[in-house]
Structures are given as structure tokens and as C-alpha cells.
């Protein structure tokens, strides 16, 4: 199987979730190979560690690629203290890391 770079998407928390007092930001990587991919979360350019969770789907039988979602979970109060949310993806198929981001309040 040849190397395939992931497509990367970022999703802000939903209004419904924020009403419940938490905020999950999701970074989604689709259709990549090999499985090794690294996701780093940055909030206002500060690297986050420890409050994100990753799950990788097993190889897709149709085209032998993987998908991965990484979820950064914060309290609503923490989420509202910061503005720029970004996930940075490193993968063999990418010549340089790919960053997807959004500004809170501009979605």
C-alpha cells in the first residue's frame, strides 16, 4: 500500500454541549496510511498535553487506510478563556505538518 496523507478537519464544540458545561474540540484525520500519525493540540499557540484522547479506527477494508479522531476536552470556563484552537498533524505522507484551526466566537 502506498503512503497516503490524511485529510484533516477540526470541529468546534456544539452549543448544546457548551450549555452542559463542557467543551470538546475534535480533530479528524481521514484516509491515511501507514497508521502512525501524530496529533498535537495547541490553544492560543500553547501546546496541550494530557487533556486529549485519541481513537484510531482499524484499517478500512476497502482501501486499507486508517482514520483517527482526537478529542480535546475542556471545561466551558477554560474553553471561553482562550481564542485560537488548533490541531497539528504530522504524518509520513505530509512533507510538513498540517495545522487546522478556528477562532472561538467566529464559527
From Swiss-Prot:
Sections of the chain in a coiled coil: none
Domain of life: Eukaryota
Keywords for the protein's UniProt record, in alphabetical order: Adaptive immunity, Cell membrane, Disease variant, Disulfide bond, Immunity, Immunoglobulin, Immunoglobulin domain, Membrane, Secreted
Record GO cellular component, one term: IgA immunoglobulin complex
UniProt record, GO biological process: adaptive immune response; B cell receptor signaling pathway; immune response; immunoglobulin mediated immune response
Broad class of the protein's primary localization: secreted
Sequence ranges assigned to domain Ig-like in this UniProt record: 6-103
Signal peptide: none
Disulfide bonds listed in the record: 27-87
Cell compartment(s), UniProt: Secreted; Cell membrane
A GO MF term: antigen binding
Pfam name, any one: C1-set
Job of this protein: Constant region of immunoglobulin light chains. Immunoglobulins, also known as antibodies, are membrane-bound or secreted glycoproteins produced by B lymphocytes. In the recognition phase of humoral immunity, the membrane-bound immunoglobulins serve as receptors which, upon binding of a specific antigen, trigger the clonal expansion and differentiation of B lymphocytes into immunoglobulins-secreting plasma cells. Secreted immunoglobulins mediate the effector phase of humoral immunity, which results in the elimination of bound antigens.
Description of how the protein assembles with itself and partners: Immunoglobulins are composed of two identical heavy chains and two identical light chains; disulfide-linked.
Disease listed for this protein: Immunoglobulin kappa light chain deficiency: A disease characterized by the complete absence of immunoglobulin kappa chains.
Name of the featured protein: Immunoglobulin kappa constant
Amino acid at each position: 500500500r502506498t503512503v497516503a496523507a490524511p485529510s484533516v478537519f477540526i470541529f468546534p464544540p456544539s452549543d448544546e454541549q457548551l450549555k452542559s458545561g463542557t467543551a470538546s474540540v475534535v480533530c479528524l484525520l481521514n484516509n491515511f496510511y501507514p497508521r502512525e500519525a501524530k496529533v498535537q493540540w495547541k490553544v492560543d499557540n500553547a501546546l496541550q498535553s494530557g487533556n486529549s484522547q485519541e481513537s484510531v479506527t482499524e484499517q478500512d477494508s476497502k482501501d486499507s487506510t486508517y482514520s483517527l479522531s482526537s478529542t480535546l476536552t475542556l471545561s466551558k470556563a477554560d474553553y471561553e478563556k482562550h481564542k485560537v484552537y488548533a490541531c497539528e498533524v504530522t504524518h509520513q505522507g505530509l512533507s510538513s505538518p498540517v495545522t487546522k484551526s478556528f477562532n472561538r466566537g467566529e464559527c
